Amino acid sequence: MNRRNAFKFLSILGLAPLAARVQASTPVVAPEIVDRKYWLRVLVKIADPLLESLSRGELRKNMPVECKPGMDADRRKVTYLEAFGRLMAGMAPWLELGADNSEEGQLRKKYIALAQKSMKMAVDLQSPDFMNFTEGGQPLVDAAFLAHAILRAPNVLWKQLDETTKQQIVVAMKSSRVITPGYSNWLLFSAMVEAFLLFAGEQHDELRMDLAIRKHMEWYKGDGMYGDGPDFHWDYYNSYVIQPMLVDILGELMKYSKKYEKTFETVVKRAQRYADIQERLISPEGTFPAIGRSLPYRFGAFQLLAQMALQHRLSDELNPAQVRSALSAVIQRMIEAPDVFDSNGWLRIGFSGHQPNIAESYISTGSLYLCSVGLLPLGLPASDPFWADALMDWTSRKIWSGQDFKADHAIND
């Protein structure tokens, strides 16, 4: 299906045009079904050029590589796995709902097929789009995001694959072990690869998982936040990487051993607190502080909040409907900024629009697809309270509109 027909199909489903922006001075008025359709429209717009190209073995041919001057040759070695692994990490829960006879179910059927074909292209040595899992440090990062995607969609991204592709994935993941992780959140990338191998019934290294868990427990700084290594960094890596991976690595280990049970309970409690903080960071206008590195990941900054909603682990302080409303405001504001996409639908570097100077040297086009993890709640069915409950103001809208509100408190653990 070409891009013109794809968007015609989306129009038939009622997924176009984009919903009206959330206005800070008025209540959120869009019906709940519009929110889901809007999120779906965003996901498809992000995913379409990437999966259409990769599924045909044309990703290298078609995907532009925007990066800092002088970094082109370096980033071309890694940007394609970045793009695919990160997109799948966010898209996986929606794909895992499977195909059905509904309009959305038929759309999922299309993208499940594209994702499965793309997976084959990514790990087949004979493919023109075979991806680099070994050269440089970056491939470990994105092998981990791809591994995380498989854990989030074990049926469509693993069980439904042919045995040859499964074995090629295992070989690719094991090959990433040649990369030594840094003494930082990178320990979790090695651990996530091993968690996938555990899931797949393959030889795995529990020590790599145990080390990552132990060090992050040591690096906890309090009130729901971990250091990135021994030091605290005021950025969004607690959400981009640390807490989503820590929760899910422990969740996978818990299927095989209860020895991590107490640690898991502690990590989830901390994640609930950090999700509370994330929701409070969203302003009445749908903005949030532009602090720290990797800002071009855009609303991927809210992966942890999105994951806690997906897993029904939000604290009692948060109603799922207010989380949906808050995230919708952020997504709309960021995705509708000018020049977010190029003329062929590929993401461009920026936080609010196209801002190439905001990128670090390690950022390239593929990096940007981490924004998709902000859309994780699409993995909840439309009947889930996250989608079905009436829209609700989020914390900052309530407080700044003058509503009385109880005090916020740190957790002491």
What residue spans do the PLM features occupy?
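Long, repeat-rich segments with strong aromatic
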Residues: 232-347, 359-382
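Low-complexity, Ser/Thr/Pro/Gly-enriched N-terminal "stalk/linker" regions
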Residues: 12, 26-82, 89, 93, ...
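CBM-like carbohydrate-recognition segments
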Residues: 52-72, 123, 128, 330-413
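N-terminal export signals
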Residues: 5-25
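Aromatic-lined, polymer-binding surfaces characteristic
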Residues: 80, 91-92, 108-268, 280-303
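An N-terminal, globular interaction/scaffold subdomain
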Residues: 83-89, 93-94, 99-108
